Amino acid sequence: MASISDAAISPSVRGRDETSNWISCPVNPAWVLEGNPVARIEHLSSSADGSASTYFWDCTAGRFNWFYNFDETLHILEGSVTLKFSDGRSRHVVAGDIVFFPKGSSAEWTVERYIRKLAFCRTALPGFLVSARDAVRRVKRLGRAPAAGGAGGMFSS
């Protein structure tokens, strides 16, 4: 099996129905409000630094809470779910819809039959690293010609 670092430098292509590495991913029993939802997950990729990853996730009928300890953008691939957000708003999302959950958010999920999503998960950098990254970017821009100039600076990438 390839390591995360190997995967980061080797492109990967998956067909919609090429899912063979599903593992059980039970909804925390304390979060289940109704029914007996059965969830599975399949890891697809991770960034070299481990801060970002993608997964297929699916779940059968049930109602449960979900708490996000990282940023997650999800794309509904199949089925539908009604999401009730902590501010009281509700939204029914279906295949093709995209939802973003920032770290620290939560939602009540009501899955009528089945849901399958593609999840893009990202762990935010600590504040001091964001500041350092931004400083490096500013330094790199110092040597660049303005975009309209077309000449490119000595630090252009």
Regions found by a protein language model. Give the residues of each.
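A short, N-terminal "cap"/entry segment at the start of jelly-roll beta-barrel domains
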Residues: 1-50, 152-157
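Conserved short histidine dyad/triad with adjacent acidic residue
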Residues: 43, 50-68
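Short, conserved beta-strand element in jelly-roll/cupin
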Residues: 59, 68-83
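Short hydrophobic/aromatic-rich beta-strand segments that constitute the beta-sheet cores
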Residues: 66, 83, 117-120
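Short acidic-glycine-tyrosine-enriched beta hairpin
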Residues: 87-103
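Ligand-binding loop in jelly-roll beta-barrel domains
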Residues: 95, 103-128
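Acidic/histidine-enriched, glycine/proline-rich intrinsically disordered or flexible terminal extensions
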Residues: 127-157
